[in-house]
Amino acid sequence: WEALGLSYPNCWESMISIFLNATSADGYNPYRITSYGIDWEIIEPDDSWSHIGYWNDHQIIYVLKLLEHFNNTNPERLKQLFGDPIFSYANIPYKIKSFKEIANNPKKTIDFDFEDHNKIMDLVDELGSDGRLLLTKSKDIYHANLCEKLLVLSLAKICNYVPGAGIWLNTQRPEWNDANNALVGNGTSMVTVYYLKRFLEFFKKLTSQIRIDNIDISLEVLLWFNEVEKTMFKYKNINHSTISDQDRMDYVSSFGKIFGNYRKKIYSNGFSTSKKLSLNKLRSFISTICNQFDETILINYSKNGLFDAYNTINIDSKY
């Protein structure tokens, strides 16, 4: 896509739209996009090899590259998209479990909702590929702006951040390729921390170029952000180098439960209405989390001049 976009720069906007329209309300993306719309893997009860899950890197690394190229080509149009509610959400029949269930078994964290899948297929028969998208009660496509879409992707990763270790790989898939399968559940990604910091700095810079103080986002996303921001302030001064395992688990469980509460709401009822988000508050939050990432990045720097790519962790649910 990058090579194609460099040859045909007018395609950047369409590429970004295709990518973001296929991300879900819980911050992940489906298996693939075909001429029939978004597609996902299906659990087959009689096939022990059938499997579902979300790869952890797609939502940040790939879309960041597209956004950076588009910003270099047409920055004014990118700023227009920031507040335009033209993006959709993929309606994937995967339900990520509660934090307690994830902590108890981080290798088995997603349920396939057969009833929801069948309802979506009925909607596809009625509406075409739009039936695979998140809809309102009147069966219209639910739309969000670029700010909300980027915020959802960011919060999904931040809520799985383990201080000193990276982003927890707890959605039944690895990153990059199947060579990392052993990291599923008991691994963390520093690769995504490095890119997420770059992603958030790009996001922050974009907000500073928008000549408004507040922006409309879905109420449920705003409440999620407010809880994460408040909890992040609580842990603002933790030392990532000396943090105890007990405090680290407390940090992880605090954000994990916040994310779980958000997912429970949207899985049951979707989005309701929109409310104003303060861009100053968003920028301050991004600065705080990036400072925490800096500490973790230093911890993962080796004397040979290289940075660690992945770590392993042991989640003790009794904490």
Give residue ranges: language-model regions.
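Acidic, mature catalytic/reactive cores of soluble proteins
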Residues: 1-319
